[in-house]
Structures are given as C-alpha cells and as structure tokens.
Amino acid sequence: MVLPTVAIVGRPNVGKSTLFNRIAGERISIVEDVEGVTRDRIYATGEWLNRQFSLIDTGGIDDVDAPFMEQIKHQAQIAMEEADVIVFVVSGKEGVTDADEYVSKILYRTNTPVILAVNKVDNPEMRNDIYDFYSLGLGDPYPVSSVHGIGTGDVLDAIVENLPVEEAEENDDIIRFSLIGRPNVGKSSLINAILGEDRVIASPVAGTTRDAIDTHFTDADGQEFTMIDTAGMRKSGKIYENTEKYSVMRAMRAIDRSDVVLMVINAEEGIREYDKRIAGFAHEAGKGMIIVVNKWDTLDKDNHTVAKWEADIRDQFQFLTYAPIIFVSALTKQRLNKLPDLIKRISESQNKRIPSAVLNDVIMDAIAINPTPTDKGKRLKIFYATQVSVKPPTFVVFVNEEELMHFSYLRFLENQIRAAFTFEGTPIHLIARKRK
C-alpha cells in the first residue's frame, strides 16, 4: 500500500524534530541493531485513527552550511513538491518572525493543505498569544506543546482530515521494484537499458506519488513488473534534486513502494557512506535486495577483480549477506538480461511460506546442533515456531521466557532456516514470544 506523505517544515529551533518524534511515536522502528546500518530520523511512518502516512522532517534534509533563508526556502519547496499535507511549525514563545512570514508566502501559493502548528505553547496562558499567527494567512493556528504532547492530537486530527482518499490495494501479481543509489551512479541509464531489452514490453503508467511516472513492463514469460520512478529521474529535476540528502528522502519513498530494491553502486567510485545508509533503510523495511555494480565496463580487470569486489561489498554491507551481487554495464548491456529473472526469484523468496511441521523439524535439528542457552541457571525452552507473514517472511518462535532468547541465538536460528529454505535476496524476521 502506498502511503500519503506529510511534510514538516519550519525555521530552526521551533521544535520540528520533537514534533516529528511525537507524531511518529514508537512507530520509528529499528528492526535490529546491525553494525553498518546508518539510520536517519528524517523519515518515519505515523498512524492516527487507523490511517497510516509517511512523515518527513524536511529540516533534516538541509545543508547546514547553506544560508539561513535558502535552507527554509528549500524545505518549503520540497514540501510543496512531495507532500500531500504540510505541517508548518512556528514558535509560540517567539511569536511571528520574518522567517515565518517568508515561508508562509511560499506556502500560500500551494494547493497542498497546510496545517499551522504553533509549538512551545507549554502553558494555558500562552494560548492567548497564538492569534497573532492568523496574520500568516494559513488558517487556524493549532497550539501545541510537542515536549509535553499537548495539542498533538488536534494536529493529527487535522492531518488525517486532509489526507487524500485511500487508494485501492495494488495487484499482488505485479512485482514492483526500484533502482536506488547516489546521484550519478547511472540509474537513469540502467532504466533505459532495461526497458530497451528485447525481452520486455514497456509502457509508462501514472504513478501514485506526486508527478511520478512509473513504468509497467512484461517479460517474455508473461510476468508483469512495475519499475518505480525513483527521485523523479524520468522528469526534469530541480537544482536541489541531485543533493544526496534530498535523494535519500526520495529513495526512501521508492523503497516504501517496492517489493524488490536494486542498490546501484558506481564501479568507478566504489562504496560510499550514502550507499550503506540507503541499503540499511531497505533492509530495515524488509525489502528484497540486489546489489548492482554498474559501469563494470569502465574498470581494468584481472582474474581477482570480481572476488575483491565481492569481498569488499560483503565487508561493507555485513547486514546484506542474503543479497545477490551482479556486475553490469548500462552502456554495453552486460548481464542486464539476468535482472528480470533475478528479481522474480527474489519476489518468490519474499512470498515463500514454510509449513509449520517442516519449520519445526528444522528448529529441533538446530537445537540438537547448538542447545539453547541458559541465563542465571534458567534455560531457554523453545516450544514451537510458525510463520506469520510474508514480504518479508516473518516467524514467531514461542518460548518460556523472551528475555532468555539472546540476539545471537536468534541469529543462529535464522541462519539455520536460511540454510534449509534459501530465501534468496530477502531478509527474514524472527520474533521470540512467550507462550501463554
């Protein structure tokens, strides 16, 4: 399901991040603590009155060295381009400032609903001061104390009221994938090369994100795919569209909409911190993953080049041991014909279901190899396991005490399940739960 987007904008020190965390609440989830996964809290999922939405803190996108007014103009532009609802945060302690008026004039021109949140209204006496904010021309101001959680429910009510109508569920038979990576790694060239393959029949379709054009194609076997438009690559972009932080946000939106994510690395430049950050988002979102090294034709190679690259990738992306690596060239079309079949196999892994009886045989065999651990004289006891969902495959292991299930033993069980059932290109999640 594609989630609508809510963007938070405002000048520095008005409490955007605090409000962001308050709205997102516990839904900013960290699936596991894995070295090498760099997290960024500019993007999360919020939920209110049974409506989910993607939440963006545009302040986290800025270049802190940029001029002050340029930063807030940048935020407003991103919000107007990306969001279905904009939350404009101002400070009740400071009153209306020149910067607030500057942003309001930009936002006034948009057709996107704007909710004016007056933050730092920490006591009832301050509520009388919020009326000055009517001068911004953005409708009723909502008094909020994000530190204390006061008034955030009213803001959330307004957000949900202004969200677009929920879209129908998409066809599960269609495999949705996206190409993500730093600017200038060759994503656009790869897209054009893939769509130029003789084996595919492509047609553009209107995307569900703002102004996006996704591409639908069918391979020679009749499998339907939708290539998610990433970062507006297929439309003319703004100057700021090629900044890395901005492309992080766009990539995360594409990840949300994808079943399988192709992480594209430039062979000429190698692996960068950005690559690990984006791959971490896809991993934590439970998406299928392929690591695509593009521009392979530009390297001088010997018999050890592939092995060296694979070793470096496995070292840099230790949390992606399950992801296949493929070396391609958009220019020469080297190995591009292998991508559709690889995407299909990973989609099958994402949707694979294991019968409980077969799964528990593997669990019992694993315990025989490596007995369950003890803590303070008490031994972990595993009663049974069952698969509860797909995309990604998720298993619940019922135990006597959740606290006795150490992360390392859970990882051992995961490895045993992988050895038995493969699960190519997809993370799998194991959850320990106390049997009632």
Swiss-Prot record:
Residues 4-167, 175-351 form the EngA-type G domain. GTP 1 binds at residues 10-17, 57-61, 119-122. InterPro entries: G_ENGA, GTP-bd, GTPase_Der, KH_dom-like, KH_dom-like_a/b, P-loop_NTPase, Small_GTP-bd. It comes from the Bacteria. GTP 2 binds at residues 181-188, 229-233, 294-297. Pfam families: KH_dom-like, MMR_HSR1. CDD domains: EngA1, EngA2. GO terms for molecular function: GTP binding; ribosome binding. The keyword Signal does not apply. GO terms for biological process: ribosome biogenesis. Keywords: GTP-binding, Nucleotide-binding, Repeat, Ribosome biogenesis. Residues 352-436 form the KH-like domain. Belongs to the TRAFAC class TrmE-Era-EngA-EngB-Septin-like GTPase superfamily. EngA (Der) GTPase family. GTPase that plays an essential role in the late steps of ribosome biogenesis. NCBIfam families: GTPase_EngA, small_GTP. HAMAP family: GTPase_Der (MF_00195). Associates with the 50S ribosomal subunit. This is GTPase Der. The gene is der.
